[in-house]
């Protein structure tokens, strides 16, 4: 079982991602440079957060054109698991592997702090270890986390159960006040139609041990391992 962690110029969350994969959920993990063209050694790929290429043009707009993203598209087409976190989510939308896109936060400020998200679909490779409706405490850290899509796309996401998480209160209520960035319908994470490519705006890799304030983030990585191996990781 081996995970590839993509690294672009400006990626800054690869070390936390490496730690949770190796030390918390116990799988092999490698850093994969943005010039790589072959992902066949890997069972899953994670695109971590950061500010790739300094967010020039817009978040993810340059990274999506890196050579490794052609390999990611081929990997996903073969059914490989791909998880994009924060900037990784933005890159996946820019690459056309997930629908929609991102705007600057509606309040015009960078947002860094704890958020709560409600599990909307617990039957995906990224949420198997979660309960439907479970509230997770996971931090956000972004200036362009405002997910938007046209009405038809938003309708399809809901009808096809492609929404993984919505921002919510600690009690699980989806309210405007619980939305840290103005995302349409409080969307915090989605999955593609085939269920193997996911993007989340909060940072699960920053919430994997109680000493950090929450261990809820490890559920996403544990879910991926469970899907790939059948091994259930206690969290």
Swiss-Prot record:
EC number of the protein: 6.3.5.3, 3.5.1.2
One cellular-component annotation, GO: cytoplasm
An annotated Gene Ontology molecular function: glutaminase activity
Chain ranges passing through the membrane: none
Superkingdom per UniProt: Bacteria
Chief site of localization: cytoplasm
Subunit structure, as described in the record: Part of the FGAM synthase complex composed of 1 PurL, 1 PurQ and 2 PurS subunits.
Protein name, per record: Phosphoribosylformylglycinamidine synthase subunit PurQ
Organism: Symbiobacterium thermophilum (strain DSM 24528 / JCM 14929 / IAM 14863 / T)
Name of the coding gene: purQ
């Amino acid at each position: 079982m081996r995970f590839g962690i993509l690294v672009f110029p400006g990626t800054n969350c690869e070390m936390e991602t490496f730690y949770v994969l190796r030390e918390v959920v116990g799988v092999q993990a490698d850093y994969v440079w943005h010039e790589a063209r072959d992902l066949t050694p890997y069972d899953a790929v994670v695109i971590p957060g950061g500010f790739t290429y300094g967010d020039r043009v817009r978040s993810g707009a340059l990274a999506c054109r890196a050579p490794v993203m052609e390999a990611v598209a081929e990997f996903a087409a073969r059914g490989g698991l791909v998880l994009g976190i924060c900037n990784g989510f933005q890159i996946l939308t820019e690459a056309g592997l997930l629908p929609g896109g991102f705007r600057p936060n509606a309040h015009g400020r960078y947002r860094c702090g704890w958020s709560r998200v409600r599990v909307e679909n617990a039957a995906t490779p990224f949420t198997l270890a979660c309960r439907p409706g479970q509230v997770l405490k996971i931090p956000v850290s972004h200036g362009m986390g405002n997910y938007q899509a046209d009405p038809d796309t938003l309708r399809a996401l809901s009808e096809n159960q492609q929404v993984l998480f919505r921002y919510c209160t600690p009690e699980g209520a989806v309210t405007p006040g619980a939305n840290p960035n103005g995302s349409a319908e409080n969307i915090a994470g989605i999955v593609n139609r085939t269920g193997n490519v996911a993007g989340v705006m909060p940072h699960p890799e920053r919430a994997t041990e109680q000493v950090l304030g929450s261990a809820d983030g490890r559920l996403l990585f544990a879910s991926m391992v469970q899907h790939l191996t059948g091994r259930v990781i206690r969290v």
